[in-house]
């Protein structure tokens, strides 16, 4: 250990922070699309570790670490190679690192080599060697290991059952028997009568040592968290999917603590099992949370692309879920916790996480489930782990009915069948209320006939930041169509939004304005089979003319309007006018704005326009689509300069304006919400034929 101290270079903290901010790694973080919060992690990079010098002198790879210092595990690192590297390269790179370290008098312990999940390896080494490792060929980035934690601090079964189907006994549409659920948790008491014969405890185990030399490993303590969650998923009496089979992987120790690296190895174990013996629908339950981790999110993305459904706890820190992993991974279904009154769960001074990275909430307080104290004992537990277990069970029920559902289709159905607008949003911080979904998970009333529905969801971007040229970007899942794009700014200063192609996919971009506090981009993402969509743009016109963007191709219908403008005064004093025609085929905008029409062709697709305006400025104006129609586009028709933006909440278009009492405005001009509502006759007909 003395060698480590003698070789370390100490930098003055202000100079070190300046080097970090100016370094190329910071620029790379802004460009990376694996997670919007990566720059937060990079900003906290190695303040006192002497790593800034390494990142400035020839290192093409980047270094990442947990933003929460107490959770960091210095000395253990995940080295991730570039995607195009050969399968043999991880071992070769590890051996090269070991050889070069040995020449410098250091020993490196190779703990694990990743092949099937991502190319890379796990090593234990001195942090003095990070400069050397970052300069190795083929290395993409290195992440310091960090801790993850269990997230647990029969009203619940009644709550997830649709109201008109409730009876004295919980009766889901099916038992989820076609689905296999992997649980990454503590060990499990497989002999408990709730789960006996339903759980297979695998031989996998990768856990850190418990803290403290006097910790006594009682079986009941070591098994408690995993046993309870296994019972919530598939227990005979208290389970959601009573027929689902469950496989247990131990990644948390007896204190409910694990590491990012252990979780990665567990996920790779699942991927290997899937490759060796492909099974039907597969759900992975991740009832744990740690600080934001690029490598853990990347692993979840790889597994999701292989057809695995991942369900994760949002976290119990009463904080933005986007700051934690795996909750922040876009490919993961992230679940917050509510109580019996459908309100957010409070756990002492903490509580459920929230924000745009949460997909929905589920029962997570005083949940009765199997106890590891004895084979017939039950116990009540609370937390987002319990909430995630409910959604994993609901997913098993849905997948048993429709085994071919993709992740995007399953997520859309979970959102569609949830109870809506039942959570008191005042519990959340004010700036998070508009971003947090007001959805509580529920079983579908029937597992048949849902295919006729045109499913859409709203995806919010991360906040752009306050600089004049700042942009925000929202994107849909690969299987979804981006049917419209809108923007929102709490200050009202923005330069509109547009849809742009990036990397073969369309994304929604929103633009901040001078003096603004930042902007959000809001994408409307839909499942539209056999769709052919395109964007038609009308550039700024003459001073006395408006702009019109048309859907001129035969059979194409308008699904959304957007506009952006470069002149600051236009955004401040003359916002663009977006009004689809009587037949939704064109978008009309202000003469100084570029107006964009999203036009789509799909079998049986039909759309119409709904508009609702008020004669004087209001803080909020809404218009909703009728039952059977789905909102695809939402925009504002303003006659005032105080529009904050427009966004979709379920099938309702919401237009927000600044509080007139605070702006001093005396304008009497109307504000209108304009909705484009669509449906697919083709999907409805196909569903009826199947029935």
From Swiss-Prot:
Q: What class of enzyme is it?
A: hydrolase
- Active-site residues (renumbered): 185, 225, 385
Question: What does the UniProt entry say about where the protein is found?
Answer: Cytoplasm; Secreted; Endosome; Lysosome
Q: Name the domain of life.
A: Eukaryota
What residues are glycosylation sites in this protein? 532
Gene Ontology molecular function terms on file: apolipoprotein binding; apolipoprotein receptor binding; low-density lipoprotein particle binding; low-density lipoprotein particle receptor binding; serine-type endopeptidase activity; signaling receptor inhibitor activity; sodium channel inhibitor activity; very-low-density lipoprotein particle binding
Residue ranges occupied by any Peptidase S8 domain in the UniProt entry: 154-460
Phosphoserine occurs at which residues? Answer: 46, 687
One GO cellular component from the entry? late endosome
**Signal sequence: where?**
1-29
Q: What is its EC number?
A: 3.4.21.-
* Control of this protein's activity: Its proteolytic activity is autoinhibited by the non-covalent binding of the propeptide to the catalytic domain. Inhibited by EGTA.
**What is one process in the GO biological process aspect for this record?**
triglyceride metabolic process
Q: Which cofactors does the annotated protein need, by name?
A: Ca(2+)
Keywords assigned? Apoptosis, Autocatalytic cleavage, Calcium, Cholesterol metabolism, Cytoplasm, Disulfide bond, Endoplasmic reticulum, Endosome, Glycoprotein, Golgi apparatus, Hydrolase, Lipid metabolism, Lysosome, Phosphoprotein, Protease, Secreted, Serine protease, Signal, Steroid metabolism, Sterol metabolism, Sulfation, Zymogen
Entries under InterPro entries matching the protein: PCSK9_C1 (IPR041254), PCSK9_C2 (IPR041052), PCSK9_C3 (IPR041051), PCSK9_ProteinaseK-like (IPR034193), Peptidase_S8/S53_dom (IPR000209), Peptidase_S8/S53_dom_sf (IPR036852), Peptidase_S8_subtilisin-like (IPR050131), Peptidase_S8_subtilisin-rel (IPR015500)
Tell me, in a sentence or two, what this protein's role is. Answer: Crucial player in the regulation of plasma cholesterol homeostasis. Binds to low-density lipid receptor family members: low density lipoprotein receptor (LDLR), very low density lipoprotein receptor (VLDLR), apolipoprotein E receptor (LRP1/APOER) and apolipoprotein receptor 2 (LRP8/APOER2), and promotes their degradation in intracellular acidic compartments. Acts via a non-proteolytic mechanism to enhance the degradation of the hepatic LDLR through a clathrin LDLRAP1/ARH-mediated pathway.
The record's comment about this protein's domains reads: The C-terminal domain (CRD) is essential for the LDLR-binding and degrading activities.
Describe the subunit structure: Monomer. Can self-associate to form dimers and higher multimers which may have increased LDLR degrading activity. The precursor protein but not the mature protein may form multimers. Interacts with APOB, VLDLR, LRP8/APOER2 and BACE1. The full-length immature form (pro-PCSK9) interacts with SCNN1A, SCNN1B and SCNN1G. The pro-PCSK9 form (via C-terminal domain) interacts with LDLR. Interacts (via the C-terminal domain) with ANXA2 (via repeat Annexin 1); the interaction inhibits the degradation of LDLR.
The protein's name in its UniProt record: Proprotein convertase subtilisin/kexin type 9
Native organism = Saimiri boliviensis boliviensis (Bolivian squirrel monkey)
Gene label: PCSK9
């Amino acid at each position: 250990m003395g060698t480590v101290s003698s070789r370390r270079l100490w930098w003055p903290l202000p100079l070190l922070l300046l080097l970090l901010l100016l370094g190329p790694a910071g620029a790379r973080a802004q460009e990376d699309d694996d997670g919007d919060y990566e720059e937060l992690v990079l900003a906290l990079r190695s303040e006192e570790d002497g790593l800034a010098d390494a990142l400035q002198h020839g290192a093409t790879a980047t270094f990442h670490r947990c933003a929460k210092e107490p959770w960091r595990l210095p000395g253990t690192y995940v080295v991730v190679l570039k995607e195009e590297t050969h399968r043999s390269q991880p071992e070769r790179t590890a051996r090269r690192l070991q050889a070069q370290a040995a020449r410098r008098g250091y020993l490196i312990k190779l703990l694990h080599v990743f092949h099937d999940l991502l190319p890379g390896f796990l090593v234990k080494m001195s942090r003095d060697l990070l400069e050397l490792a970052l300069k190795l060929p083929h290395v993409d980035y290195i992440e310091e290991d960090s801790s993850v934690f269990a997230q647990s601090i029969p009203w619940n079964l009644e709550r997830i059952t649709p109201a008109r189907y409730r009876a004295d006994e919980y009766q889901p549409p099916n038992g989820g028997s076609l689905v296999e659920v992997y649980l990454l948790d503590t060990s499990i008491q497989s002999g408990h009568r709730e789960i006996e014969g339903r759980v297979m405890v695998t031989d996998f185990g990768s856990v850190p040592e418990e803290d403290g030399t006097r910790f006594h490993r009682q079986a009941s303590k070591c098994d408690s968290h995993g046993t309870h969650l296994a019972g919530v998923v598939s227990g005979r009496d208290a389970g959601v999917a009573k027929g689902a089979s469950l496989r247990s992987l131990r990644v948390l120790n007896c204190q409910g603590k694990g590491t990012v690296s252990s979780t990665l190895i567990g996920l790779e174990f699942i991927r290997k099992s899937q490759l060796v013996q492909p099974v039907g629908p597969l759900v992975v339950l991740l009832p744990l949370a740690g600080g934001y981790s690029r490598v853990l999110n990347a692993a979840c993305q790889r597994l999701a692309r292989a057809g695995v459904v991942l369900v994760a706890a949002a976290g119990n820190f009463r904080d933005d879920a986007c700051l934690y992993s795996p909750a922040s991974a876009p490919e993961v279904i992230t679940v917050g916790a509510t109580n019996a009154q459908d309100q957010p769960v409070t756990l002492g001074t903490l509580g459920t996480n929230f924000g745009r990275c949460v997909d929905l909430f589920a029962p997570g307080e005083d949940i009765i489930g199997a106890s590891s104290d004895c084979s017939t004992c039950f116990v009540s537990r609370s937390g987002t782990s319990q909430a995630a277990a409910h959604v994993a069970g609901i997913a098993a029920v849905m997948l048993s009915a429709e085994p071919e559902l993709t992740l995007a289709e399953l997520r859309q159905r979970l959102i569609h069948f949830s109870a809506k607008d039942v959570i008191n949003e005042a519990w959340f911080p004010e700036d998070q209320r508009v971003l947090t979904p007001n959805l509580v998970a529920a079983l579908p009333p029937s597992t048949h006939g849902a295919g006729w529905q045109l499913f859409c969801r709203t995806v919010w971007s991360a906040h752009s930041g306050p600089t004049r040229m700042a942009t925000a970007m929202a994107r849909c899942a690969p299987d979804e169509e981006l049917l419209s794009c809108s923007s929102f700014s709490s200050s009202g200063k923005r330069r509109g939004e547009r849809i742009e192609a990036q990397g073969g996919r369309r994304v929604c971009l929103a633009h901040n304005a001078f003096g603004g506090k930042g902007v959000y981009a809001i994408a409307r993402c839909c499942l539209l089979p056999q769709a052919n969509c395109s964007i038609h743009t009308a550039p700024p016109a003459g001073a006395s003319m408006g702009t019109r963007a048309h859907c001129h191709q035969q059979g194409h219908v308008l699904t959304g309007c957007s506009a952006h403008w470069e002149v600051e005064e236009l955004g401040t004093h003359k916002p663009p006018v977006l009004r689809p025609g009587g037949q939704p085929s064109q978008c009309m905008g202000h003469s100084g704005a570029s107006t964009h029409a999203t036009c789509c062709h799909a079998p049986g697709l039909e759309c119409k326009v709904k508009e609702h305006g008020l004669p004087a400025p209001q803080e909020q104006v809404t218009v909703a689509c009728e039952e059977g129609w789905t909102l695809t586009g939402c925009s504002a028709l303003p006659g005032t300069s105080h529009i904050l933006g427009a966004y979709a909440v379920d099938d309702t278009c919401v237009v927000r304006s600044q509080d007139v009492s605070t702006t001093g405005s005396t304008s009497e001009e109307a504000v209108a919400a304009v909705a484009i509502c669509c449906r697919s006759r083709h999907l409805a007909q196909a569903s009826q034929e199947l029935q």
